[in-house]
Amino acid sequence: MVSIVDNVSEVLDTLLAALSSGLKQTVESYCDIQTADSEDTLVACDGSLISIMKIEGVKALVGQEEYERIHDGILQNLSNSLAEQGHSIQVFFGYSRDKVKEVIKDNYAPTVQTLSDLKLNLDDLMDERLTHITNYCGFEEIYIVVWSKMTLLTGDQAKRAAKEKSEKISEKGYNVKTCQNVIAAIPDLRNLHDSLIKSLGQVLSSLGVDAETLNVHDAVHAIRSILDPEFTDKKWRPVLPGDKLNPKLSSTFDGDISEVLWPSLAHQIIPRDAVNLDLHTVKVGGLIYSSVFIDLFPKEVQSFMSLFNRTLPTGI
């Protein structure tokens, strides 16, 4: 009788968890990233592949002529690849006056260490310089997120991939809701995704753009530090497939392999709850997030600085 009650309770818990996730009632349900597939590729819950490139800057001063050359070069070289329905690109730009002091302090770390080695007490001078420079600087970061989605596959390929994944999960017999689904990736997408990443890297390099494809640990750290910088240490790194695990089995361990696998990536990326302030804004720690939509695009191509100059005074 007890076993029947336990089974019914487990089924109800599973159904309620699935319903809660489907209705987006938990903050983790908004995270689409499931696990890592390779050194520089993440996997979404539906099997799509994701890579993140960090733009460090350009190798020359950019005026209007250089800007148009870079724009036209990217457009000409990537039009065919991005014309396919399954490839998409997201661009993230971040600006913060709060982070700049820490960045400048890190840049001065070698100088401070040299002064310490020479036993020179110039802390007051360094603090004054740090404060002065901070008043004239802002922290900026740019990331390009490349997606290769299931729609790249033919109907037969997609059905076969879904069937194989379902069979593997049933065969392994673990609960992918509480751990990372290490077989989430769709093998047929790998070559297509890797080809696009390689092509994009070569195009950016040829145009003088300094870009780096992040390894999965740095990529997840970047995501979390953007979402919740107050709760993310510089040395924090996610636990991903291939990393060493030190599982602690509970006294109620019933042999479910999910308890000794890598923990859910959604829980690692979103470490604490968010608060809905209204239908349009959400608060995470000390930050408030909201959406901005551009309904009518300009007829002529303009630099991002045009938009940036208009939004900066608003304090966004």
What is each stretch, according to the model?
Residues 2-316:
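Extended, folded cores of ATP/NTP-driven motor/assembly subunits in large transport
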